From Swiss-Prot:
Domain of life: Eukaryota
Annotated spans, Disordered: 68-87
Functional note: Probable heavy-metal-binding protein.
Claim: Lipoprotein is one of the keywords in the record: yes
InterPro entries attached to this UniProt entry: HIPP (IPR051863), HMA_dom (IPR006121)
GO MF term set: metal ion binding
Gene designation per UniProt: HIPP12
Domain HMA, residue spans: 1-65
Modified residues (Cysteine methyl ester): C115
Lipid-modified sites (S-farnesyl cysteine): C115
Gene3D superfamilies: 3.30.70.100
Organism the protein comes from: Arabidopsis thaliana (Mouse-ear cress)
Protein name: Heavy metal-associated isoprenylated plant protein 12
Family label: Belongs to the HIPP family.
């Protein structure tokens, strides 16, 4: 990531918008900002390609090219309190009902000499 700051010689709002739209369509551009005649472009970009495209629209000069400045991390003034871990949630599952056994009443003769009709 790098920041490219360019000085643009723009006289009207239309030229300013055209310059912004030209830079926005380049690959690798993350953000574009125009303030007081300065164009700030952030992203993985080639500064030479930006100037080459903008020279067709208006007079362009380099002001600076450099890496993105990361915001300073503030150190916490208060000491960190130890985080209390919430108790583990225990789920009580109801065991399934035991299977129901069906009694099969088979038919059989107790009299071995019974008559069988065929």
């Amino acid at each position: 990531m790098q920041v490219v700051v360019l000085k643009l010689d723009v006289h009207c709002e239309k030229t300013k918008q055209k310059a912004m739209s030209t830079v926005c369509c380049l690959s690798g551009v993350n953000s574009v900002e125009v303030k007081d005649g300065k164009l700030t472009v952030t992203g993985e970009i080639d500064a030479y390609m930006i100037v080459k495209k903008l020279k067709k629209i208006c007079h362009t000069e380099f002001i600076s090219v450099g890496p993105v400045k990361e915001p300073e991390k503030k150190k916490p003034d208060d000491p960190k309190k130890p985080e209390t871990k919430p108790p583990d949630v225990i789920y009580h599952y109801v065991p399934p009902c035991p299977p129901y056994y069906h009694n099969f009443n088979g038919c059989y003769n107790e009299d071995p000499n019974a008559c069988v009709t065929s």
